[in-house]
């Protein structure tokens, strides 16, 4: 993968998929600026400690990022067992706010990679709602929209992964045509990460056991990270506006 001298920002860098993505990117010559609320235990070229759940924390992080970058990997996220407002803020509103704010810093030919989920696969059932939310400009404005269009707490994780997929696909081509910056989603299935058990709790034993029979095993974080890194590389320069499942075939079993 051609990543030498590319300067890439990775959120959620201190654990799981984010940490593995940073390792893969650096192994291929990229310069990695990590962002996380927790201190990392891996080697990075730079690190910004930040809380991405509110605009003030995001603005503080942005002020410490380079003026020119080549990519943004939005990997920070919280499971559906977290407070529903936190899920909305981190997994969607904050991600969108950060991405829109740093777009002007991403150089032509750059790439944005958003980590969605196979749990967002039912986005067509709520397409118009997701498009409407995606058109809302601003973090607090998004919160206001959600107050008018509340999401059931037990469904919030799936809902905001759906919303992320729709926003990414709707927005990607307009940005690419105007700035030559691509945006795509990577949709993991179950992954061996520190929060895997949280997803088991969120989905329940019945759904978890049903899905377990559909795949050989959960993914290892580096298997997802390799695809994220590829989407930042020159070799993927003509891929834009798609959502790529990295799930060992899980999504295909629902066809």
From Swiss-Prot:
Keywords assigned: NAD, NADP, Oxidoreductase
Keyword Iron applies: no
Taxonomy, superkingdom: Bacteria
Active-site residue list: 157 (proton acceptor)
Keyword hit for NAD: yes
UniProt: NAD(+) binding residues: 12-17, 36, 51-52, 77, 157, 161
Gene3D superfamilies associated with the record: NAD(P)-binding Rossmann-like Domain
GO molecular function per UniProt: coniferyl-alcohol dehydrogenase activity
Pfam families: adh_short, adh_short_C2
GO BP: any one term: eugenol catabolic process
EC numbers, comma separated: 1.1.1.194
Transmembrane segments: none
Reactions that this protein is recorded to catalyse: (E)-coniferol + NADP(+) = (E)-coniferaldehyde + NADPH + H(+)
Binding positions for substrate per the UniProt entry: 117
Family the entry assigns: Belongs to the short-chain dehydrogenases/reductases (SDR) family.
Cited NCBIfam families: PRK12428.1 (NF009092)
Function: Catalyzes the conversion of coniferyl alcohol into coniferyl aldehyde in the eugenol degradation pathway. Specific for coniferyl alcohol; does not act on cinnamyl alcohol, 4-coumaryl alcohol or sinapyl alcohol.
Protein name per UniProt: Coniferyl-alcohol dehydrogenase
Gene: calA
């Amino acid at each position: 993968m051609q990543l030498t001298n590319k300067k890439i920002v990775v959120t959620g860098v201190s654990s799981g998929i984010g940490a593995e993505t940073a390792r893969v990117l650096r192994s291929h010559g990229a310069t990695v600026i990590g962002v996380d609320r927790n201190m990392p235990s891996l080697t990075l070229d730079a690190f910004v400690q930040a809380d991405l759940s509110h605009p003030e924390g995001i603005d503080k992080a942005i002020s410490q990022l380079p003026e020119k970058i080549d990519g943004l990997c939005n990997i920070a996220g919280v499971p559906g067992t977290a407070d529903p407002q936190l899920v909305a803020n981190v997994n969607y509103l904050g991600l969108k706010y950060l991405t829109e704010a740093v777009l002007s810093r991403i150089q032509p030919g750059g790439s944005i990679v958003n980590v969605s989920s196979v749990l967002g696969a039912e986005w067509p059932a709520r397409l118009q709602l997701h498009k409407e939310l995606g058109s809302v400009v601003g973090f607090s404005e998004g919160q206001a929209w959600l107050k008018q269009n509340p999401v059931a707490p037990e469904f919030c994780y799936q809902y905001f992964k759906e919303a992320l997929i729709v926003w990414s696909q709707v927005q990607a081509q307009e940005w690419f045509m105007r700035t030559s910056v691509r945006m795509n989603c990577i949709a993991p299935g179950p992954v061996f990460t520190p929060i895997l058990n949280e997803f088991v709790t969120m989905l329940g034993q019945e759904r978890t056991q049903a899905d377990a029979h559909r795949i050989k095993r959960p993914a290892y974080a580096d298997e997802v990270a390799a695809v994220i890194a590829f989407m930042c590389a020159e070799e993927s320069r003509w891929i834009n506006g798609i959502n790529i499942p990295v799930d060992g075939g899980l999504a295909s079993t629902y066809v």
